[in-house]
Amino acid sequence: MKLSLILSIALCSTRVVYAAGAEAPRISRNTVKLHSYNESRVCRHDESSNQTVSHAAMFTFNFQDGDGYRVYQVPRCLFNTHAAREVLSSVDMTETLESYRKRFRVYFVVPIYGAYRLVARSPTAKYPGGVLNPPPASSVTMQDLIVDATNIHTVVPDKLCVITEHPVIFSMKVPCSHQVITWTGYTVTVSLAQKFFVLTIKPTRDHTSENTLAMFFGDVREVDLKAPYTVGAFLLRQTPDHDLLVVVKQTAFIQRYMFLTDVVFLQRTLSADYADTSVCLRVLSVLASVVARGKQCGLITRDTVEFFFTYSLCQLMANGTRYQSTAPVSTALWRQSELELFGEFIRHCFKTTTPNPTPAFQTRMQLTEKHKPAHSSNAIDVRVLAATYSSGMHAASMADLAFLLRSTRIPPNVNTDALLQKLLFTTDAYYRMSLKIPLSGSMRRILIRVDLTVRTQLNESSVARRHFVLLTSMCSPREQISWGELLMNPQRGAPSEIYSPCVSGGRRDYTGPSVRALMESAHRPERRAEQVMSVTEALRPKRSQMSDEANCVPDSTQGAVITANEKTYLISSDFIVKGLAIPVSNTVVDRNLMITVLDRRSPCVLSRSYRERGSVIVMNNITFTERCEFCASTLVEYDEVDGLTSIMHIPSIEVLKYLTDPENDILVATPRVHYLLLTANGTVFEVTDILVNVRPSMPYSVVVALVIIAILMALGLYRLCRQKR
């Protein structure tokens, strides 16, 4: 009876109540005009009658009330509509009252005593930007860019999100984009519609929906709930603009999601001005910091749920942003690159088996009209063309563009060197500065984009290999110490902010004991070492994602990789892969050091025995000229007891002079410390005396003059000898 009353009230009343916005004009509450009949008829609702009533055009319900009847009527024509059939097919008309009551207890209902809160904007909720700010505006505007970036964040719905036969929610079909994040333990799904998103969290091994948490946020008026539930039953949070509904079974709530009733749940996110994408990204960075520092990668906790919620929210807010054609490109490129960087953070932190969940801009980018080829058959390499227009950009914006156009499985598969070549000057400058001072936040912001751009290019691009060896060289003991200090700052957590070249994948020789010893020697708390290793293991790429010649080496194997133009050096404690093995003899017992020389693009073959063996060529000193014959070589410092310590690339004569200057105190002259010079052609030298004499080469004109003088002297001596005969 109760269900019949609900249906009659809903269908015979013309007053429509919205969650927000204007009301429909008021008409008499209990009348519905039927235009499908010749004469006007009205349905009777809650009227008294002294006899039962029936009508061919109506469903009529007569309930005895004393000596009379209460009459309720529903027009038959309303049940012929698609909406009515959808409603009736979703409702069990034969359900008993007892079953109805039990069903109400199946799902978690938000308690009145404190979990539900209206979250207001907090003027004191300030999130310092740090490097999470757009770079300085450049002279390049949206209309100058070769690709249309005015809607750079907009993701066109390519799927239909469907909810059918749900115990709580009426059937719903909404155009959306669908992002799946899967790792050992859980599957997280972000379904992004135009006005709201749905975040679902489900244990991977659970093939039912018993433990699934669903969070609807945004303008959720399209979500209709079945009786006995109302919107208020699942309304966990409200802001002035949006609502949050949570749908989860009571047993799952008790076992897994009790944090939903925490008063501070989502407070940091919803109290900020999250409609501003830049602010949303800063909040997300703080949550990423909590997850990474708290060793919560791969877990489902209150902090990780807040992180995934805010990640979804930032995408929803950015999705509706449109930039003016005259606006500088800096803000748009920075925001999109940050969104995709957070996707990389998720992929590495949670060790997902799915790719970067952020929809890549390059999958939907289109050339602007003025850059489209005259004929469709003319292929245009976007990266080459982008490099020609990047001269007016700040280096940070150029790094954003290079990262957004990074090579993936999306054609073209080979990233040209155009943008990377322009960024090489910046990477080289930062490397030279890192020899003197710690890396700054703005440097790290650019270097992470360079790192993620070159990782997949180590097989094809010589420029990418030069970037990689510079990043490897920046991972020094000084960097480990300064990075440890940075990781202790709770306000820094975005991938851009906590990046270190030590997670680029070049140096895997740093271990827990070695980092602890380093921190102890620098008088740093032991917790610094634990933090450094925790973040390193969480964010460092797998070897399988690197260059071909060393991608089969297990990730657990310690060692360093140094890339030259046509050679790759693998430094480890033992022989691991097939290649030219060069043992290093100057180590103590039980401290082995092996250098394996590999050809670029050669297949990686695991092997514990070597057939090719080389040797280290010992040189008392090496003399360089201004032509820098050994430039593009790498100087490796190792300790007889502690093993590999520093890697220093030599890109230019200026760097060589700085490294060998005694006043800079970089090269150490002790009996335990040795230096190896790894050249570009695969030869390994040991410099025993740490003596490198840099002297200018003779000018060409002087050489020619000396040669002429020598010839004349020889000719004079020849004639003199003939005369004496």
UniProtKB/Swiss-Prot annotation:
InterPro entries: Herpes_gH (IPR003493), Herpes_glycoH_C (IPR035305), Herpes_glycoH_C_sf (IPR038172). The chain crosses the membrane at residues 701-721. It is a single-pass type I membrane protein. Residues 20-700 are virion surface. One of its GO terms (cellular component) is virion membrane. Residues 184-247 are annotated as: Interaction with gL. N-glycosylated, O-glycosylated, and sialylated. The heterodimer glycoprotein H-glycoprotein L is required for the fusion of viral and plasma membranes leading to virus entry into the host cell. Following initial binding to host receptor, membrane fusion is mediated by the fusion machinery composed of gB and the heterodimer gH/gL. May also be involved in the fusion between the virion envelope and the outer nuclear membrane during virion morphogenesis. Interacts with glycoprotein L (gL); this interaction is necessary for the correct processing and cell surface expression of gH. The heterodimer gH/gL seems to interact with gB trimers during fusion. Belongs to the herpesviridae glycoprotein H family. This is Envelope glycoprotein H. It comes from Murid herpesvirus 1 (strain Smith) (MuHV-1).
